[in-house]
């Protein structure tokens, strides 16, 4: 799917999945509203631990809303190289390999995928490795990210004649 959209002069951008983030913000706000209405109907006389959970839901809704409005670009891949948060990780001339890895955590309910980029450090013969986290609310899948890396790497190799 992504391969058809990629061009040698274009770029591949990974940001937030705004629809998902706004749905999460709305659900948290609905949870807070339910708790607030219940507290008002009880005239704030019977506040308990669940009342604080509803307050936390309000804070979460604000955070999700701000995240949805963010213009942050997590990963940018183009003909020059791979960028993380608009900072160059490696140019294609120094690129060696990239793959998807899952960071192991003892207790978690979410995936912890990372894009692992292996490269030569600028001006040296030392290798480097950068683990770029792939969020659960990003607008591109792990497979699409890896496909974009392969596409631009192949385009670079064709450009230099390898």
Can you name each region flagged by the protein language model?
Residues 1-42:
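N-terminal membrane-targeting/pre-transmembrane regions
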Residues 8-14, 90, 130-134:
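Generic detection of short hydrophobic beta-strand segments and adjacent strand-loop junctions
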Residues 14, 75, 82, 98, ...:
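Hydrophobic beta-strand residues in large extracellular and virion-surface proteins
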Residues 43-56:
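Hydrophobic alpha-helical transmembrane segments
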Residues 56-62:
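Alpha-helical transmembrane segments and their membrane-interface exit regions
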Residues 62-97:
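Conserved beta-hairpin
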Residues 85-124:
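Acidic, Ser/Thr-rich low-complexity segments on the non-lumenal side of membrane proteins
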Residues 115-162:
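A membrane-cytosol interface segment of integral membrane proteins
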């Amino acid at each position: 799917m992504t391969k058809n959209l990629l061009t040698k002069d274009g770029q591949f951008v990974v940001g937030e999945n705004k629809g998902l983030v706004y749905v999460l913000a709305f659900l948290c706000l609905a949870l807070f509203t339910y708790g607030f209405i219940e507290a008002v109907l009880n005239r704030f006389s019977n506040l308990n631990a669940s009342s604080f959970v509803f307050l936390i839901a309000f804070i979460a809704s604000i955070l999700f809303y701000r995240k949805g409005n963010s213009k942050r670009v997590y990963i940018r891949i183009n003909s020059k190289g791979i960028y993380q948060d608009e900072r160059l990780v490696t140019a294609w001339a120094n690129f060696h390999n990239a793959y998807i890895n899952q960071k192991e955590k003892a207790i978690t309910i979410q995936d912890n995928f990372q894009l692992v980029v292996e490269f030569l450090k600028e001006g040296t013969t030392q290798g480097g490795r950068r683990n770029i986290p792939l969020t659960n609310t990003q607008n591109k899948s792990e497979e699409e990210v890896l496909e974009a890396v392969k596409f631009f790497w192949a385009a670079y190799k064709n450009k230099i004649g390898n």
